[in-house]
Curated annotation (Swiss-Prot):
UniProt similarity note: Belongs to the UPF0149 family.
Record lineage: Bacteria, Pseudomonadati, Pseudomonadota, Gammaproteobacteria, Pseudomonadales
Pfam families linked: UPF0149
A Gene Ontology term for the protein's cellular component: cytosol
InterPro entries named in the record: YgfB-like, YgfB-like_sf
Protein's name according to its UniProt entry: UPF0149 protein PputW619_5026
Length: 184
């Protein structure tokens, strides 16, 4: 087995070594939540929101990692893919730890979305997605180390890879340009 760190583990080590007691999953959820609410992709605004969660101003290496994370999220949300990659522990991590990180991701998403949604009208589907995220954020301890628990985790994770795209499309995606009238 190769001794390479997962992106989650590497980011967790970076945050911890710089005195930031926050999960990479929560930060990633915060970033995607704020982006889906229409906050845009300005680095300074993202860094300001992240600083609130980090509990102190990020050092240069953490700032660079946060900006890199934002660029990745921007590419995912504005690209052609129909799913996002969640920053979560690897599959080799015990299910309870992965479930906790999944809950933290949802909590971060809800916080980021709430900070930036500013009273926007939401469709019924968008409201259901947010209700699902709130429910998922609270079921962390319900998943057990079993085949059923693993299956439930994978199902929830797959849902979370696509559900935010509905919110992004509804609230934040740039509108397609209106067709220009043709002159005859």
């Amino acid at each position: 087995m190769p001794n390479t760190q997962s992106p989650y583990t590497a980011f967790a080590a970076l945050l911890s070594s710089n005195g930031h007691p926050v999960s990479p999953a929560e930060l990633h959820g915060l970033l995607i939540g704020r982006s889906c609410a229409g906050a845009g992709f300005e680095a300074d605004a993202w860094l300001a929101d992240a600083a609130g969660v980090l509990e102190n101003e990020p050092e240069d290496n953490v700032r660079a990692a946060l900006i890199g994370l934002q660029e990745m999220v921007k590419a995912e949300l504005t690209g052609e893919d129909i799913a996002i990659v969640l920053l979560l522990p690897s599959d080799e991590t015990p299910l309870t730890e992965r479930a906790t990180a999944l809950g933290q991701w949802c909590q971060g998403f809800i916080a980021g979305f709430g900070l930036n949604a500013g009273g926007k009208d939401l469709s019924t589907d968008a409201k259901e997605v947010l209700q699902d995220l709130v429910a998922i954020s609270q079921v962390q301890e319900a998943l057990e180390e079993s085949e059923d628990g693993e299956s439930d985790y994978m199902e929830v994770m797959e849902y979370l890879r696509v559900a935010p795209l509905l919110l992004y499309t509804e609230l934040a995606a740039p509108a397609a340009p209106a067709p220009k009238p043709s002159l005859h």
